[in-house]
From Swiss-Prot:
UniProt-recorded name of the protein: Telomere length regulation protein TEL2 homolog
Gene expressing this chain: TELO2
This protein's record includes keyword Membrane: yes
Organism: Homo sapiens
Site (Interaction with PIH1D1): 490-492
Residue positions where Phosphoserine is found in the record: 456, 485, 487, 491, 688, 836
GO annotations of cellular component type: chromosome, telomeric region; cytoplasm; cytosol; membrane; nuclear body; nucleus; TTT Hsp90 cochaperone complex
Length: 837
């Protein structure tokens, strides 16, 4: 026979029947009050055994019955909201876990927008505001052995963390502010603090507690990407609580230790980002990094080598945490070894984005600042070997930021690891990053805070000067003796200073007046002043005497290409380059043929080869400039055939064209005259053919002929990748300058073949040049010619560009690939308009 139903079961069954069928408000009110006996709210209270039976077996059915009866008419059975308040008290005063689950079940089961849905949602918001979520988690922290407890915990875990998603899906436009993720997870963080405080109180009272459920809630919330909201509230509160309580520290350590492995990375990353300083991080984590392998991997590998999201203060907190305990310091030394090994790896330098390389460099310097000389001494040889390998690879890089990182880190590492040896010194441009890195390498002592610095500076700035200028005149003569001498001291103030801004240094050697004289002075003269005067006058003479220049153009280009600085001449490189550009512009084809032939010749330095590329680019730009041919010469110009002068040439003393005084006066009148209107539209500059049209092939094609043939001293596909990158950029620039020329299509086809042969180059600077070259082709050729002559090449390039835009480690390469893809898409849209529906 089945056992007889208990008194509680019979009472609950009768109450549910009455609540389901009765329409009498007084009867319903009395029934609910009778049930509240089992919650300990009414007199006479039920027995503890009856309360436990009601809470474990009958509370959820009662709540479901109350939720099913919810309607406007049912709540109005009693006036003044008495029935509604009594109805809500069952959800707010009984077991929090069951009330929460019934609330969520009713909300998720509601069929569309309704009165019941909104009423239950508002009741859930009140449930959260009154701290019932903390009560729910406190109940899960007690050691429980009831059947189904694990299943209940998993259900609660999913509902608690995913509450904003569930409510957002059900309420949509009617969602309440309490359920917004940014608000809910902050509230959840505050409730976690309350639960941890309750756990501490229980431990102080001698009761056992567990924080595993809270750890799972924290881990799942962080995995969902809500670290900032929940830890932004949790970490400052815990930092304050753990500062003076070792028991709070132990509870925090246990909280993080019991986070599931799948959520450990998200939680630790959020803690490192939220903790202000290594002291706070150490109080929250303890020696977790030593005990937990997953935590050790995250803290010493993933955050340092595989990510670059941590800022400099976060890196200092993380590595400072490793340095603050004797059990963790061996990990810090091991981290430094692995960081330097990665920093010095040629493969990592080629395939790692620049932000990640900066991240690793900062971590290396912070580690060095945290470790002492005795700890570094035992690993000196290993660290020096990694550092020297890294310096070599970084100085060979084509990217200036990579080279600068190598110089800065090498200086600091060598000084710290081998202080008694000769220091490494490099010359590099100081910028914000270099100053930050050097500051990381030499941190201030613990006592040198900002406040101390501020107090030391205040007296210096507030203290009046010990002596005034009047007191130190004439060797300290008293001011009373100088009272009558003020007029004598100031008597020269009425004189106007002589203007010496136009003065020029007197030269004993006169500047040459002919191009041949300049060639002779540059090649044979031992007079330094005459040599310098010839160099400064050469550009202007070339532009003013094109006929004489063409007679010796190749010889002059050869002289300038091999010219070395005999003495310290201000702007020597610029003078030499502008003179070479002037010669190339004046006689383009022969000089371009000579320069391109010398680019692949023996016995030239990399600097000379890059100078050739720069000169070709600048000369092509000058030749393609509109109005460069047939331009009216300035009055006073000695030759009617003078080409357009570059601005730099006009600014030089030796190449300035004398201006007629009438021109000066007319220009002043024009600048001072205000005209309200003019009769006709202003005409644009007169059009003229591009001089680059006929010589573009001389500049372009010879540079492509031998790039894959190594020489004894020059290998573009080997170590000289810097020049290869400059060559790719130069070819792209020449392609842009050849727009609308007859040879542009052939140039574009050859350039795409060059790009295709090198598309998988390991150097980022070379890839940047290749991607720029592709964009140059797309911008320079007419759309019809691209589709007619280069369709196959463009189809091949499209898939490569998409792959680069998605996977290339260099950010600039990804950006250039995206621009090229946009140009291709624009070309497609222009030629193939969308079909009408």
């Amino acid at each position: 026979m089945e056992p007889a139903p208990s008194e509680v079961r019979l009472a609950v069954r009768e109450a549910i029947h009455a609540l389901s069928s009765s329409e009498d408000g007084g009867h319903i009110f009395c029934t609910l009050e009778s049930l509240k006996r089992y919650l300990g709210e009414m007199e006479p209270p039920a027995l503890p055994r009856e309360k436990e039976e009601f809470a474990s077996a009958h509370f959820s059915p009662v709540l479901r019955c109350l939720a099913s009866r919810l309607s406007p008419a049912w709540l109005e059975l009693l006036p003044h909201g008495r029935l509604e308040e009594l109805w809500a008290s069952f959800f707010l005063e009984g077991p929090a876990d069951q009330a929460f689950l019934v609330l969520m079940e009713t909300i998720e089961g509601a069929a569309g927008p309704s009165f019941r849905l909104m009423k239950m949602a508002r009741l859930l918001a009140r449930f959260l505001r009154e701290g019932r979520l903390a009560v729910l988690m406190e109940a899960q922290c007690r050691q429980q052995t009831q059947p189904g407890f694990i299943l209940l915990r998993e259900t609660l875990l999913g509902k608690v963390v995913a509450l904003p998603d569930h409510l957002g899906n059900r309420l949509q436009q009617e969602n309440l502010a309490e359920f917004f993720p940014q608000n809910y997870f902050r509230l959840l963080g505050e409730e976690v603090v309350r639960v941890l405080q309750a756990v501490v109180d229980s431990l102080q009272g001698g009761l056992d507690s567990s924080v595993s459920f809270v750890s799972q809630v924290l881990g799942k919330a962080c995995v969902h990407g809500r670290q900032q909201e929940i830890l932004g509230v949790l970490v400052p509160r815990l930092a304050a609580l753990t500062q003076g309580s070792y028991l709070h520290q132990r509870v925090c350590w246990r909280l993080v230790e019991q986070v599931p492995d799948r959520a450990m990375e998200a939680v630790l990353t959020g803690l490192v980002e939220a903790a202000l300083g290594p002291e706070v991080l150490s109080r929250l984590l303890g020696n977790l990094v030593v005990k937990n392998k997953k935590a050790q991997f995250v803290m010493t590998q993933k955050l340092l080598f595989l990510q670059s999201r941590l800022t400099t203060p976060m890196l200092q907190s993380l590595l400072g945490h490793l340095a603050m305990d004797s059990q963790r310091r061996p990990l810090l030394l091991q981290v430094l070894k692995e960081l330097l090994e990665t920093w010095g790896s040629s493969s990592a330098i080629r395939h790692t984005p620049l932000p990640q390389q900066r991240h690793v460099s900062k971590a290396v310097l912070i580690c060095l600042a945290q470790l002492g000389e005795p700890e570094l001494r035992d690993s000196r040889d290993e660290l020096l070997a990694s550092m020297m390998a890294g310096v070599k690879c970084r100085l060979d890089s084509s990217l200036p930021p990579v080279r600068r990182l190598g110089m800065i880190v090498a200086e600091v590492v060598s000084a710290r690891i081998h202080p008694e040896g000769p220091p490494l010194k490099f010359q590099y441009e100081e910028d914000e990053l270099s100053l930050e890195l050097l500051a990381l390498a030499s941190p201030q002592p613990a006592g040198d805070g900002a406040s101390e610095a501020g107090t030391s500076l205040v007296p210096a700035t507030a203290e009046p000067p010990a002596e005034t200028p009047a007191e130190i005149v004439d060797g300290g003569v008293p001011q009373a003796q100088l009272a009558g001498s003020d007029s004598d001291l100031d008597s020269d103030d009425e004189f106007v200073p002589y203007d010496m801004s136009g003065d020029r240094e007197l030269k004993s050697s006169k500047a040459p007046a002919y191009v041949r004289d300049c060639v002779e002075a540059l090649t044979t003269s031992e007079d330094i002043e005459r040599w310098e005067a010839a160099l400064r006058a050469l550009e202007g003479l070339v532009y003013r005497s094109p006929t004489a220049t063409r007679e010796v153009s190749v010889e002059l280009a050869k002289v300038l290409l091999h010219l070395e600085e005999k003495t310290c001449v201000v702007g020597f490189a610029g003078l030499r380059q502008r003179a070479l550009v002037a010669v190339t512009v004046t006689d383009p084809a022969p000089v371009a043929d000579y320069l391109t032939s010398q680019f692949y010749a023996l016995n030239y330095s990399l600097r000379q080869r890059m100078d050739i590329l720069d000169v070709l680019t600048l000369a092509a730009q000058e030749l393609s400039r509109p109005g460069c041919l047939g331009r009216t010469p300035q009055p006073g110009s000695p030759s009617p055939n003078t080409p357009c002068l570059p601005e730099a040439a006009v600014s030089q003393p030796g190449s300035a064209v004398a201006s007629d005084w009438r021109v000066v006066v007319e220009e002043r009148i024009r600048s001072k005259t205000q005209r309200l209107s003019k009769g006709g539209p202003r005409q644009g500059p007169a059009g003229s053919p591009s001089r680059f049209n006929s010589v573009a092939g001389h500049f372009f094609f010879p540079l492509l002929q031998r790039f894959d043939r190594p020489l004894v001293t020059f290998d573009l596909l080997g170590e000289d990748q810097l020049v290869l990158g400059r060559l790719a950029h130069t070819l792209g620039a020449l392609m842009c300058l050849a727009v609308n020329t007859t040879v542009a299509v052939a140039m574009g086809k050859a350039l795409l073949e060059f790009v295709w042969a090198l598309r998988f180059h390991i150097d980022a600077y070379v890839r940047q040049g290749l991607l720029s070259a592709v964009s140059s082709v797309l911008l320079s050729l007419p759309a019809a010619r691209l589709l007619e002559d280069l369709m196959d090449e463009l189809l091949e390039a499209r898939s490569w560009l998409a792959d680069v835009a998605e996977k290339d480690p260099d950010e600039d390469c990804r950006t250039l690939a995206l621009r090229a893809l946009l140009l291709l898409q624009r070309l497609k849209n222009r030629l193939l308009p969308p079909a009408s529906p």
